[in-house]
Amino acid sequence: MLKYLNQSEAINVDLELFNEYKFSVDQLMELAGLSCAHAIAKCFPADRFGRVLVCCGPGNNGGDGLVCARHLALMGYLPVLYYPKPTPKPLYENLAHQCKRMEIESISECPSVALAAECYDLIVDALFGFSFKPPVRADFVPVVELLQQTKLPIASVDIPSGWDVEAGKLNECDMEPTLLISLTAPKLCAKHFKGKHHFLGGRFVPPALQRKYELNLPTYPGNEMCLEL
């Protein structure tokens, strides 16, 4: 049976990938963001959902979002970045620079619900990952409220933003994405996910690490970067 990770297990799996298996952060981020773009393309084709608002947070989840935006652009989408608190580290600065050089538009103000409905077909939620602890910081309140109130479909990267990593929704107004892309392995909160599509991405887990944590990951078909759970 597929294992759902608690918060400490998710953190430890990541640490082992870095320390024991010598993956770099940017290496895993590239593979994770690429798999997110592939999952989005399977569920929301570019000819109908081409205008994508990609909301990025300050940590690794936001980095995954920056990578995802770049690959969506290469797949024929028109992503627009909302990145309210850029991380002042070379990795994130480079990812943001790559998006800029890919001619991906960036906005500095979070759009209203009405403006988002007019300008976009889909929202990518790459705000907070499995290290998130509430409450939401002031910088991110407007975009979390947009995610809670919009009628647009939402694709969440690893954890729906604002959810508890293990318990899921903390209150009734928390958003419910249409697509959840669990990375490496699903987290416990995914058991509470009621949206239409749940995908697994991040095809990089070494066999010994899978065995140690009894992840029981499904086999990815062929050369796929993601699979539907």
From Swiss-Prot:
GO molecular function terms attached to this record: metal ion binding; NAD(P)HX epimerase activity; nucleotide binding
YjeF N-terminal domain boundaries: 10-217
Q: Name one Pfam family in it.
A: YjeF_N
Q: Which residues bind K(+)?
A: 61, 125, 161
Kindly give the SUPFAM superfamilies that the UniProt entry links to this protein: YjeF N-terminal domain-like
Tell me the keywords, alphabetical order: Isomerase, Metal-binding, NAD, NADP, Nucleotide-binding, Potassium
Cite the InterPro entries for this sequence: YjeF_N_dom (IPR004443), YjeF_N_dom_sf (IPR036652), YJEFN_prot_NAXE-like (IPR032976)
Q: Which cofactor does it need?
A: K(+)
* Cofactor remark: Binds 1 potassium ion per subunit.
What's a GO cellular component annotated to this UniProt protein? mitochondrion
Query: What does the record give as EC number?
Result: 5.1.99.6
Q: What role is this protein assigned? A: Catalyzes the epimerization of the S- and R-forms of NAD(P)HX, a damaged form of NAD(P)H that is a result of enzymatic or heat-dependent hydration. This is a prerequisite for the S-specific NAD(P)H-hydrate dehydratase to allow the repair of both epimers of NAD(P)HX.
Report the sequence similarity comment from the record: Belongs to the NnrE/AIBP family.
Q: What HAMAP family does this protein's entry cite?
A: NADHX_epimerase (MF_01966)
> Cross-referenced NCBIfam families, in alphabetical order?
yjeF_nterm
* Name listed for the protein in its UniProt record: NAD(P)H-hydrate epimerase
State the organism of origin.
Answer: Drosophila mojavensis (Fruit fly)
Q: What is the lineage of its organism?
A: Eukaryota, Metazoa, Ecdysozoa, Arthropoda, Hexapoda
